[in-house]
């Protein structure tokens, strides 16, 4: 009996005309393995990178298509190559770095070396040593190239396919999806930040979630309360072909009210007691002539293109086994801006250390309402990663520009966010302090955060370093700038409480 027939027996599909699907499609390991071959390696296209991420010849990025590791590289001034990230000799990982620049890829195991197009060029001891050993006489390097993949570029987005007979990328996308991508990527972009989070669910659930416009104004309190995205606005759902690709959109300026509809239903999403102390986060400007202010586009199976007002991002979905997936966020903009910063110098260790002790204790003891008081009124708070700092990405996983925004974040945590009950414990490292001539103190301290769940399960949640600016105020020392630089670029699930 074929594998398909076995799955057909194990997974009981409903009768024709019923829209519900068996829950087993999200939990069946055999189906997951089948998806890797028939779907991700089938006649489709998978997003892997933006061209701006690998601008120079030799620049590369490693990624995954399904759960298969791949490399995409700029192999010449006007072309890209991609191949499976496994040596053709023994299948070991060829490239361990996430990004970089090379003129060749050499396997560390046996030193087989490949050019930028994946062609095998050199084999260590090809002819043996001192006349002994070596490869067989009929060994040809051209027979042992890497598994090459098709690459096509559309509006600066790089897609790859395992199927060399797959239709061209633009045909795969379809006219409606292609038009929306052109709308978003009408100009060259600049990458602002890239971060990832691990989610404990089957990858298909996330792709279905972004297509589910039913939940958006019911679950997301900020969207409904502050009229960012509501059912009372003009909008809709656009499907392409068989419905695998989609766009859900709304136009904020067309809101007809509708608050009574939410209130009469007793829905949590409409919360008139939820107010912002700093509403700059809601301010936006018309960036597109069509008036669309909220658009989520899903390109099946692994890409989401986001426009939430002026917040633009790509989301890359990577399966991590049948019960997990990783979501990579790539934020971008199409004009270059950078804010200058001023750093200081000199020692104030004996005064600064108690500030950090009190800061960590405030979070660990869940006194979250007091957390914003550690900051100046005009301040900068950011959670980012070492990888993002290395690449000079200006935005973070979390970012606030005033004490008001910090207060709003705590209110959101209490009123809008839904998450499993958990507690945290900070472990603080060595403190390094110096002050500038204008009185601004620059401080740096390592930290680790342990997370304790309701079940009692205890785990290392985050580790990193704070890079801060501290100033003297009438109330004492306060943070003017606090940047938490995380060691890992992948966060387990999400960050809710302060770091």
Spans of model-derived segments:
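A solvent-exposed, acidic/Ser-Thr-rich amphipathic alpha-helical stretch
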Residues: 377-446
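Non-catalytic accessory segments flanking enzyme active sites
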Residues: 19-21, 25-65, 70-71
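Short, low-complexity N-terminal intrinsically disordered segments enriched in polar/charged residues
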Residues: 343-365, 373-377
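C-terminal catalytic domain of Rieske-type non-heme iron oxygenases
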Residues: 149-342, 346
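Generic beta-strand structural signal
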Residues: 64, 74, 114, 152-153, ...
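A beta-strand edge to alpha-helix "cap/lid" segment located at domain peripheries
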Residues: 432-499
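Rieske [2Fe-2S] iron-sulfur-binding domain
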Residues: 54-164, 171, 175
């Amino acid at each position: 009996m074929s594998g398909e027939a076995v799955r057909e027996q194990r997974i009981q599909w409903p009768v024709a005309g019923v829209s519900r699907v068996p829950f087993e499609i999200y939990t069946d390991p055999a189906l997951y393995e089948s998806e890797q071959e028939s779907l991700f390696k089938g006649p489709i296209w998978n997003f892997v990178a933006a061209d701006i991420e690998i601008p120079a010849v030799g620049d590369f990025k490693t990624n995954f298509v399904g759960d298969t590791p791949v490399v995409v590289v700029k192999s010449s001034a006007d072309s890209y190559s991609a191949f499976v990230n496994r040596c053709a000799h023994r299948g070991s990982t060829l490239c361990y770095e996430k990004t970089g620049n090379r003129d060749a890829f050499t396997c560390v195991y046996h030193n087989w070396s490949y050019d930028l197009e994946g062609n095998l060029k050199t084999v260590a001891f090809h002819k043996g040593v001192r006349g002994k050993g070596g490869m067989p006489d009929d060994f040809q390097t051209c027979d042992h190239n890497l598994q090459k993949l098709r690459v096509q570029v559309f509006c600066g987005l790089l897609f790859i396919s395992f199927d060399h007979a797959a239709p061209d990328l633009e045909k795969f996308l379809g006219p409606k999806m292609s038009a929306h991508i052109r709308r978003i990527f009408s100009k060259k972009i600049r990458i602002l930040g890239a971060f990832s989070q691990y989610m404990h669910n089957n990858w298909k659930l996330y792709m279905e979630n972004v297509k589910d416009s039913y939940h958006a104004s019911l679950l997301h309190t900020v969207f409904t309360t502050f009229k960012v995205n509501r059912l009372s606005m003009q909008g809709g759902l656009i499907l392409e072909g068989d419905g695998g690709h989609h766009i859900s959109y709304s136009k904020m300026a067309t809101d007809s009210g509708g608050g009574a509809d939410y209130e009469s239903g007793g829905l949590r999403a409409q919360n008139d007691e939820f107010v912002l102390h700093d509403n700059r986060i809601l301010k936006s400007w018309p960036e597109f002539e069509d008036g669309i202010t909220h658009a989520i586009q899903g390109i099946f199976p692994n890409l989401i293109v986001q426009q939430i007002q002026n917040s633009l991002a790509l989301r890359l979905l990577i399966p991590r086994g049948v019960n997990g997936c990783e979501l990579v966020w790539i934020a971008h903009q199409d004009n270059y801006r950078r804010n200058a910063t001023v750093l200081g110098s000199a020692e104030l260790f004996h005064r600064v250390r108690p500030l950090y002790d009190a800061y960590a204790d405030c979070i660990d003891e869940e006194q979250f309402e007091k957390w914003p008081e550690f900051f100046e009124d005009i301040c900068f708070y950011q959670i980012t990663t070492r990888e993002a700092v290395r690449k000079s990405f200006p935005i973070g996983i979390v970012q606030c520009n005033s004490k008001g925004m910090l207060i709003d974040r705590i209110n959101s945590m209490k009123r809008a966010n839904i998450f499993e009950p958990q507690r945290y414990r900070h472990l603080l490292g060595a403190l390094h302090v110096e002050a500038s001539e204008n009185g601004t103190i620059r401080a740096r301290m390592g930290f680790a955060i342990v997370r304790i769940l309701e079940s009692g399960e205890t785990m290392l949640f985050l580790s990193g370093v704070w890079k801060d600016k501290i100033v003297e105020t009438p109330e004492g020392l306060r943070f003017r700038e606090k940047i938490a630089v995380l060691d890992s670029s992948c966060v387990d699930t999400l960050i809710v409480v302060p770091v």
